[in-house]
Each structure stands twice: as C-alpha cells, then as structure tokens.
Amino acid sequence: MKKKAIIILIIIIFVAIAIGTIIVKKSNNNVAQDGIQKIKMSEVTRSVFYAPQYVAINNGYFKDDGIEIELTTGQGADAVMTSVLSGESQIGFAGPEASIYVYNEGKEDYTQVFAQLTKRDGSFLVSKEKNDNFNWSNLKGKTVIPGRKGGVPYMTLEYVIKQKGLNSKTDLRLDDSIKFDLMASAFTSGTADYVTLFEPTASNIQKLGKGYIVASVGKEAGEIPYTAYFAKKSYIQNNEKMIQEFTNAIYKGQKWVKEHTAKEIAEAIQSFFPDTDLDLLTTAIQSYKDIDAWNETPVLKEESFNKLQDVISEAGELKQKAPYDKIVNNNYAYNACK
C-alpha cells in the first residue's frame, strides 16, 4: 500500500509539473527563443498615411528594443477594436473614436490610447471631372462616396461641408452604402461625382485618368487625432515596458520621416506597397508632407481630442463625451520624448 501511495504521489507531481510548464509556455507564447517579443497589431487599413509606422518597422526600431511586429489589416476601426477586445491582437491602430465608444458602453477593461501618429484626416476629395478651380460649393447637387456613416472619414467630411456653408442632407447626397475597401472601384465604375480616398489610392486614380484630386479634407478640417495606438487598459498595466519600447519606436519613426524627403521615405517603406511604383509612392508621401499630416511626437493633446469629440457630436454619433484622462494615457509618449 505504501509503495502504491508513493507511485501515485510521483504521478501527481509529474502531472503538476507538466501543467505548470504548459501554463508558463502559454503565458510566454509571444516571446521567441531569441528573446524577441512578438506583438500582434491590427491596423485599420494599409496606407501611405501611416508612413512613420512602416519606417519604424523597416528601419528596425522595434527590433532594436526586442519587439517583432506581426501586422494585420482590419479594414475598419470596428474590426480593429474587435480584434483587440477579443485578445486576437494586443495593439490596435485606428481612430481614437473607437476607444471613446467602448468606454461609453461601460466596459470595465476598456481601451486606452497611448500614442498618436497622424494629426488630421488623410483623405483627399477626388472628382470625376478635372477642376483646377474647385470650390466646395461645386458639391451642390452631386453624389459623394464618403465611407461608412459613423466613421471618422465620413464625419470629418461632413464637418468640412458644414463649415463651407452647405447642408450635407439637402445640398448633396452622401452615399454611405459602399464599404471602405470598395470605395475606389465603386467610384471609377459607378455614377458618383466625388469620392474621398487615402494615398496612394487617390494618386493612382489620378495617374490612371479616372479621377482628379481637388482638395484635402484634412487640410480643411484642421487638427484632430485621426489615428492612434491603443490597447486594453489591463494589457497596458501588465506590459508597461513593452508599451514604452513600442512608443519609443514610433517616435523614432516620426522623427525620421520629418527629417527625410518624400523619395527617401518612399524607398524606406516600398516593401509595404509592392504594387505601387516608387514615383507614385513619392508623390503620395509628398501630398501628406504638404498638408502636415503626421504628429511630430506620440503625445495626444487634450485640445485636439476635444475637437474630435466635437466633430463626432455634430454628426450625432456621440451621446456623451468621454473624459480625456480616461481615454488617453500619455505617460509613455512623454517618456519617449525625453
């Protein structure tokens, strides 16, 4: 009996060790054998608009701090947020409005924004007809494809339209039935007069002679925190070192982009746009330099955050404003800039 009890005890010990090993492996499943931490990040779309991010990846700024980015494209802020909340991705990259909505829903482990990349809308208004003397009043009686209703591209355009003295409901038609990734093809093959497109798509449409860039939505709307990085509050608290290193890499990318020419940036990020030639990529990047699209630091200012909420409120998509200090955690951005 004694021998049998010892055997049972030994079996129990081995089982406990095996379970413990599995738990440890699971908790470290994002850490490779070489010490590199793999981070799954979901970006809202693939665009030249996010050049500082791609520079940070290709220039090795993340790897310098022991981070390997596994990048996926969510095609929409909703999809990105779902990926983060489900744990499929650790970091999301989309508009801060997604975090505002989640907070207002009363979710306990809501997401916090810890670094800002772009500081204005990155879309350009593209016309079917060439118009060297475009005026926003030209939109009267026309059909525009602005993206999904409730999305920031839609709301920012609507904000500009109102600022220009037009009524978005009676003076023109905003066709919000087209999915974000189908807007360009719907415009070139359909009857809409205008569409809002990001680069390099906008410049490519113009190069093909299927449309003409007539205005920058972001230049007209002014500064708002258009795209930023966020993660669940609990994840940030439990991974402060990684979040700091991630933010440091983004800041290095922002500085590099500021200090280099459009062509140099195009050469640095071309691997992310294999179907776009270097000249077109350079043109697209210059468009963003011309409108001062990128934040110089990862810090998200309260003034621009409040303006974003004003834009959303005017569109009727925000029942109550969220507190800046709940949604935004600038600690890591400030540290990166030291």
Please give the residue ranges for each predicted region.
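Soluble non-cytosolic domains of exported or imported proteins
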Residues: 74-78, 93, 147, 151-155, ...
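Predominant activation on well-ordered alpha-helical scaffold segments within soluble catalytic domains
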Residues: 54, 100, 158, 203, ...
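Short, low-complexity disordered leader/linker segments with a strong preference
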Residues: 1-38, 336-338
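Pocket-lining segment of extracytoplasmic ligand-binding domains
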Residues: 98, 107, 179-273
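Conserved C-terminal helix/tail region of periplasmic/extracytoplasmic solute-binding proteins
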Residues: 306-338
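Secondary-structure end/capping motifs
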Residues: 237-319
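Short, glycine-/small- and polar/acidic-enriched structural segments
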Residues: 32-169, 173-177, 186, 193-199, ...
